[in-house]
Amino acid sequence: MADSKRTGLGEDGAKATYDRLTNDRRAYETRAENCAQYTIPSLFPKESDNESTDYTTPWQAVGARGLNNLASKLMLALFPMQSWMKLTISEYEAKQLVGDPDGLAKVDEGLSMVERIIMNYIESNSYRVTLFECLKQLIVAGNALLYLPEPEGSYNPMKLYRLSSYVVQRDAYGNVLQIVTRDQIAFGALPEDVRSAVEKSGGEKKMDEMVDVYTHVYLDEESGDYLKYEEVEDVEIDGSDATYPTDAMPYIPVRMVRIDGESYGRSYCEEYLGDLRSLENLQEAIVKMSMISAKVIGLVNPAGITQPRRLTKAQTGDFVPGRREDIDFLQLEKQADFTVAKAVSDQIEARLSYAFMLNSAVQRTGERVTAEEIRYVASELEDTLGGVYSILSQELQLPLVRVLLKQLQATSQIPELPKEAVEPTISTGLEAIGRGQDLDKLERCISAWAALAPMQGDPDINLAVIKLRIANAIGIDTSGILLTDEQKQALMMQDAAQTGVENAAAAGGAGVGALATSSPEAMQGAAAKAGLNAT
């Protein structure tokens, strides 16, 4: 349906590109299926699975519990309820406003308003639900693709693609070259003109027949922008093409662990797959042996006088003729083997509990958690996960903010912001508590400064330098807070002038009072000379 043939990365078409890049993705799919097998199998089903598939439950629950626990803590640290991102002006613009603290405060107030609008948009469109599912996919499969639709209407939730539903190709630096997604949709749900074009090229189809819709986004060499179009049954859909700047592409491929030179990432579970598989086998053996051991079987001497029929019919307290030596119960006598298996299983479970952070119980269950609890979780995540924060901040949080800025500016929901002057910054880890952390920093800084009051009279201490170092250590920008030397001199001169005026007024008032008391006639003459009517 397209009038002109595409060139560059879009030359082969969406379906052909998808089929070609699927071979590179297959190894990552296999690893994701193995990881899901020992955690939550339904998170990454096999290609042959469908809605009616009854997944085999793992013999151990450490994998599933650890996955949900780690995803919840990542969600709390990366996307807290407070603002987890900040809009700041560039360093050059900030230096221009250093001499105008009021102007700098107004700019910061305006940027805070934009932040609140973005956060409200995220909450009202249920982004957190999809983001939590995305984090679970990253832990199991290591890859996920987010799509942020254009703000049309009052509800625009984002869409998540599993690794099995898209392909991606990157350059040597990790930049996205092209992405192809596959959506399955009923033929009757397509627009009428699209159905007509598909039937014209491929024959009639039933209305409930499922067809594949491919969306191809690729980098254009000439313009440097991303071009997008959709394709059904090798037919390009008219009106589906779009152009996106490189910093505002609504298709965001996210990786959990980045490997240099690879288009896809590795999962967190993959790093501990050996322990997960070993624990699964040990738990299966222990459970089966426990079931066998729990089966009670009595043995009776066939040559003895004790009759099993009488024993089974006897009630509690009855007397049955027989000999104790004729009866014995079957035992496996495998306690030593059980002890070894249990010890190894406990060691593996302890390692996995540390890896998935199952040992931390400081976070209570409730609707509201304190900033100290969030700070503890973020600190523990930083110690355990290492560089995961840096990857997610660059591949998930920062692109998300940039896309939302572009989309909300295009729909006039936020004012136009100059790209060269406004820079979005992402807060992760201990800084992910957002604007509430700013208030906490200010309170800590003021408390530390207040503790310096007893040192005012010490001639050996430079309090101005100490105050500045305290602010820098906490992370407070002192522009507009601490007075400069010029501002101090201006205030001192203003205070001196005000004091001089007050002293002169007091002295003049005292002189007039004395004159009026000593000589009323002289007071009247002075008043008449000044043009005043003395009464």
Swiss-Prot record:
Taxonomic superkingdom: Viruses
Compartments, as annotated in UniProt: Virion
Keyword Transit peptide: no
Keyword rRNA processing: no
Any one of the GO BP annotations: viral DNA genome packaging
Major site of localization recorded for this protein: virion
Record's function text: Forms the portal vertex of the capsid. This portal plays critical roles in head assembly, genome packaging, neck/tail attachment, and genome ejection. The portal protein multimerizes as a single ring-shaped homododecamer arranged around a central channel.
Protein name in UniProt: Portal protein
Biological source species: Enterobacteria phage T3
Organism lineage string: Viruses, Duplodnaviria, Heunggongvirae, Uroviricota, Caudoviricetes
